[in-house]
Amino acid sequence: MIGRIAGVLLEKNPPHLLIDCNGVGYEVDVPMSTFYNLPSTGERVVLLTQMIVREDAHLLYGFGTAEERSTFRELLKISGIGARMALAVLSGMSVHELAQTVTMQDAARLTRVPGIGKKTAERLLLELKGKIGADLGAMAGAASASDHASDILNALLALGYSEKEALTAVKNVPAGTGVSEGIKLALKALSKG
């Protein structure tokens, strides 16, 4: 198995990459979330990878984070979901958004990903429940605790608070609280520390 690849980025054509590793060019497909964070061509790149061996091809998929690769692997375990569909899901939403979608059982949000219909979305929600990122799932659970918790959480993260601090503060915000008031309450809770 090839678990990691490091080399010079030669070509970028979404979602395909060509990476030179000591004179050998590896073709790697990446989700758009990884693609947008790549360096310019000619620069060094490091990706975590998942190799898929099929009868007619050996394919390499690359990821910028361990969470993305782990989620990709979980998606592959679901009947009817292949590597292309898993890549489409990760290109259509971040791992955090997917965890939040699964926690809230929001099939409509999943159907916005090209190639995913209602039945596939429902199967994904059922199969992924409790399986993707425990920390991300906890964050998604906290975000669903109040109507605007997701916005409050993002504001705290943007202010430089850690995910753990932000989650703890958001859990103390009563459901139905507006974003502005929720941020004030969360900041107050954080200042009491």
UniProtKB/Swiss-Prot annotation:
Transmembrane segments: none annotated. Its main location: cytoplasm. The keyword DNA-binding applies. One of its GO terms (biological process) is DNA repair. InterPro entries: DNA_helicase_Holl-junc_RuvA_I (IPR013849), Hlx-hairpin-Hlx_DNA-bd_motif (IPR003583), NA-bd_OB-fold (IPR012340), RuvA (IPR000085), RuvA_2-like (IPR010994), RuvA_C (IPR011114), RuvA_C_sf (IPR036267). The RuvA-RuvB-RuvC complex processes Holliday junction (HJ) DNA during genetic recombination and DNA repair, while the RuvA-RuvB complex plays an important role in the rescue of blocked DNA replication forks via replication fork reversal (RFR). RuvA specifically binds to HJ cruciform DNA, conferring on it an open structure. The RuvB hexamer acts as an ATP-dependent pump, pulling dsDNA into and through the RuvAB complex. HJ branch migration allows RuvC to scan DNA until it finds its consensus sequence, where it cleaves and resolves the cruciform DNA. This is Holliday junction branch migration complex subunit RuvA. The gene is ruvA.
